[in-house]
Amino acid sequence: MENKGEKIAMNPTVQTLAQKGDKLAVKLVTRGWASLSTNQKRRAEMLAGYTPAILAFTPRRPRMTNSPPRTSRNSPGQAGKSMTMSKTELLCTVKGTTGVIPSFEDWVVSPRNVAVFPQLSLLATNFNKYRITALTVKYSPACSFETNGRVALGFNDDASDTPPTTKVGFYDLGKHVETAAQTAKDLVIPVDGKTRFIRDSASDDAKLVDFGRLVLSTYGFDKADTVVGELFIQYTIVLSDPTKTAKISQASNDKVSDGPTYVVPSVNGNELQLRVVAAGKWCIIVRGTVEGGFTKPTLIGPGISGDVDYESARPIAICELVTQMEGQMLKITKTSAEQPLKVVVYRM
């Protein structure tokens, strides 16, 4: 480094500047290279036309291999193999019951059950298995604070058990809550993290395919069949094991039904009633075998509307319906009790 400093000090340009009184050149010539600061040394190099060697550096890039993230049993699904749905859906409209004897309504918790999961049930037709990671039933009141009556929610993790028909049976359920009609209440249902097969038919073992059974009980109201609130189901469900799409339309006659349960048929003499299990938009096609085999279908219920196109000669009826709540009906009167009818129901 001293040889470098001496060479720069002896440079003709530096010597000339020193003779002219340049402070940097004078300092370098009289006091030496070591007396200069870093910036002064750089300036002296520039004055002498000295170009330092260019050093090339190749940055080191460490190679890292990230292992696949470890997932837990309760983690969300993986793209291409499963799908996670987190949603809140309308379960039912709650109606009051008079007197001290309670009324009961129940639902089996299964992803393809349209009555419980109106929207999820359509997606579930593409999968074989499911796992519930969070489940809550919410009661939302729609009555005044002066309304009398009680609303109770219960859950049984064994869907094969007979639903309760008494207060004693209801309060024997493993999980239940109760509230005044004008007060909101949540039933948080414990989940077990198990992966279950999705129910394909009524003959499947409920202990293996169904998550459990929800129960609603009402009593003590001043008026019967008055709307007091709504039930919502909030869930996170992982659908897995993709499969071919199951049937998405329901076909039935007076006795046998195939496909998802959108409507529940019941026969009373010459009358066929189709009870819609959930709110939504539906296309219902009714066909007979002889001319004038049935009359024009009629809509029954405060929450149903739509158009009915009817031809008696064929005979056929095409009904485009909107239901605002579950339990609305389509009534068909046959000209003969033995007259068979075919019904096909589509979700719109």
UniProtKB/Swiss-Prot annotation:
Pfam families: Carmo_coat_C, Viral_coat. Residues 82-239 are annotated as: S domain, virion shell. Residues 64-84 have a biased composition (Polar residues). Its cofactor is Ca(2+). Residues 240-348 are annotated as: P domain, projecting. InterPro entries: Capsid_prot_S-dom_vir (IPR000937), Coat_prot_C_Carmovir (IPR013669), Viral_coat (IPR029053). It comes from the Viruses. The keyword Calcium applies. GO terms for molecular function: RNA binding; structural molecule activity. Binds Ca(2+). Ca(2+) probably promotes virus assembly and stabilizes the virus particle. GO terms for cellular component: T=3 icosahedral viral capsid. Keywords: Calcium, Capsid protein, RNA-binding, T=3 icosahedral capsid protein, Virion. It is found in: Virion. Gene3D superfamilies: 2.60.120.20, Carmovirus coat protein. The keyword Transcription regulation does not apply. Homodimer. Homomultimer. Belongs to the icosahedral plant coat protein family. Capsid protein self-assembles to form an icosahedral capsid with a T=3 symmetry, about 32-35 nm in diameter, and consisting of 180 capsid proteins. Also acts as a suppressor of RNA-mediated gene silencing, also known as post-transcriptional gene silencing (PTGS), a mechanism of plant viral defense that limits the accumulation of viral RNAs. This is Capsid protein. It comes from Carnation mottle virus (isolate China/Shanghai). The lineage of its organism: Viruses, Riboviria, Orthornavirae, Kitrinoviricota, Tolucaviricetes.
